[in-house]
Amino acid sequence: MSPKFLSLLTAEDLKDVTALDVGCGTGQLALTLAPLCRRVIGIDRDAEAILKARERTGALSLHNAEFVIADADVEEYTAWAPQLVAARLCMSPAIIARSGRALGPGEVLAFVCFHRDQWKETGVVSRFAFDEGEIRALLEGHGFTVEHLEIEREVHQFASAEEGVAQAAGLRAKWESNGRWQRYVEFLEGGGRTLTRSHLIVKARRR
């Protein structure tokens, strides 16, 4: 998890805060926040991920963290009354809109999301990826003032096409299903020798 992202969260006084982790997966972010917050709720539509998050909570003996099966793009967040909404690699216009409705003045939405340059060598832009202007406009349009926005980028460089294939081997099955793999191989065969990981780190405060 990005140290910069964590520092943006922990810069807030969290001891009396109810935090909502949207798209929580198996709970990594929520369980990191739990010792710092009054209460943490993680939501995800993946029932298996929620079960694992609950198991991790029990193993850590955390009593202020709970995990709920819910679609972050569909459910309204007001029922959980959060003072902080956080997300890691789960972002959409619907999430920003729901956060804007749930948070009060001065309260924070903080997240890491895919930048449009994520895996740019594959020639496919994720529908969950944004550039700086897009994310700023969405936030400002839903009542937020952007306090921090930066790109965290890592470019892997390879000496050969074979090395590039090996670097992305863990992504092959997923990329074959969405058309990325063949384009990435073509990029390497054409002389390309990079693979870019690029995220936006954002903190915004409700006006």
Residue ranges and their predicted role:
Residues 108-134:
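Conserved class I S-adenosyl-L-methionine
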Residues 136-151:
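A SAM-dependent methyltransferase catalytic signature shared across enzymes that methylate proteins
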Residues 1-17:
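Conserved alpha-helix/loop element of class I SAM-dependent methyltransferases that forms part
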Residues 96-108:
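A short glycine-rich, Lys/Arg-flanked "PGG" loop and its adjoining helix->strand segment in the class I
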Residues 20, 26-74:
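Class I SAM-dependent methyltransferase SAM/SAH-binding core
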Residues 82-96:
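A short SAM/SAH-binding and catalytic strip from SAM-dependent methyltransferases
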Residues 150-207:
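Conserved Class I S-adenosyl-L-methionine
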Residues 74-84:
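A short acidic, Gly/Pro-enriched loop at the edge of an enzyme's catalytic core
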